[in-house]
Design a protein with these regions (language model features):
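Intrinsically disordered, low-complexity, charged terminal extensions of DNA damage-control enzymes
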Residues: 1-24, 29, 192-349
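Catalytic cores of DNA base-excision repair glycosylases
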Residues: 2-203, 207-216, 220, 284
């Protein structure tokens, strides 16, 4: 079977398979652009199982574009807490405000127009355009790339922009009229549940009869990726300063990693216990007791933090920080996961 014939065969086998095997996910109950868009943004870099609860809480808090546009940013970030990549949440609100101000909350119906909105790339634009507006717009992510590279036995690295572009263009040509949304979701479902990175379920795959990688017994050889750069490791010391049941927190810079989020005071180096107490003293907290030393690790996309935390009881609440109880930290402050793991441990003190 020629490559163009493989693409052409996809709708015929995937659509019936999807109708029988689609998972029941909350964002699949609607074609409302707002809800589909929020789900697609949340699903970037995040497992479906983890997203469901976040999605339902987010929709309860902000049921419309207008509600999100009018929300306090701190509330948006708090509901996003734990999903990571917080720029996604900020861009959601930017787009909501833009659509509310210029389009009365309505979404454009083409991938090209959607891609001009903050935080919406080619994949999300294709997903919303096809699912909500039945446009023949491909949504090509890692799942879809893996499917196509295996079916066509293409050994080019999938992180080459040209590869993604070519696959998107080829898929757009075979989108079935009136079933564009179902076809997009069928591809997503196949990649998530059957054509998985490891241990693919080839025996139940609807594309088995024309998958070149399956026929040659080389499924897990594909897709090919260029070697990843080694993650940089950074040592950090986190000061968990406590005074009368309240803990010191501060806001990070509005630019860079974890921009604008709350954190426990910290320094980008490993300090011994004595130096950590001296550092706490320099913040005018009058430290009186080192209670606990603890160690945590957090891995970002490009960097690994090795963190040493010191719980230090203090006599004074320095004005350099905001001081909050554990209950307030839980309820009101958007703490990134890197720091949240320390607050969880503080509950045991």
């Amino acid at each position: 079977m020629e490559q163009n014939e493989i693409y052409a065969a996809l709708p015929g086998v995937l659509l019936p398979w999807y109708e029988k095997n689609a998972r029941d996910l909350p964002w699949r109950h609607t074609k409302e652009p707002y809800r589909v868009w929020v789900s697609e943004i949340m699903l970037q870099q995040t497992r479906v199982e983890a997203v469901i609860g976040y999605y339902e809480r987010f929709m309860e808090a902000f049921p419309t574009v207008q509600a999100l546009a009018e929300a306090d940013e701190a509330r948006v970030l708090k509901l996003w807490e734990g999903l990571g990549y917080y720029s996604r949440a900020r861009n959601l609100q930017k787009t909501a405000k833009l659509l509310t101000e210029t389009q009365n909350g309505a979404f454009p119906d083409t991938a090209e127009a959607l891609e001009k909105l903050p935080g919406i790339g080619a994949y999300t634009a294709g997903a919303v355009a096809s699912i909500c507006f039945e446009q023949p717009a491909a949504a090509v992510d890692g799942n879809v790339l893996r499917i196509i590279m295996r079916m066509t036995a293409d050994d080019r690295p999938i992180d080459l922009p040209q590869v993604k572009k070519e696959i998107g263009e080829a898929l757009c040509k075979v989108y079935p009229k009136g079933r564009c949304g179902a076809f997009t979701q069928a591809l997503m479902e196949l990649g998530a549940c059957v054509c998985t990175p490891k241990s693919p379920k080839c025996e139940v795959c609807p594309t088995q009869s024309f998958c070149r990688a399956y026929k040659t017994g080389n499924v897990t050889k594909y897709p090919v990726k260029r070697p990843k750069a080694v993650k940089k490791t950074e040592e950090r010391t986190v000061l968990l300063l406590e005074c009368n049941g309240r803990f010191a927190v501060e806001k990070r810079s509005e630019t860079g990693l974890l921009a604008g989020l709350w954190q426990f005071p910290n320094v980008p180096q490993k300090l011994d216990a004595q130096t950590a107490v001296q550092t706490a003293q320099s913040f005018h907290t009058d430290p009186k007791e080192l209670v606990l030393e603890t160690h945590k690790t957090h891995i970002f996309t490009h960097i690994r933090w090795e963190m040493t935390g010191y719980v230090i009881r203090c006599n004074a609440m320095s004005e350099a920080f905001t001081w909050a109880s554990l209950a307030e930290l839980e309820r009101d402050f958007a703490l990134p996961t890197a720091f949240r793991q320390f607050s969880d441990e503080l509950k045991t003190l």
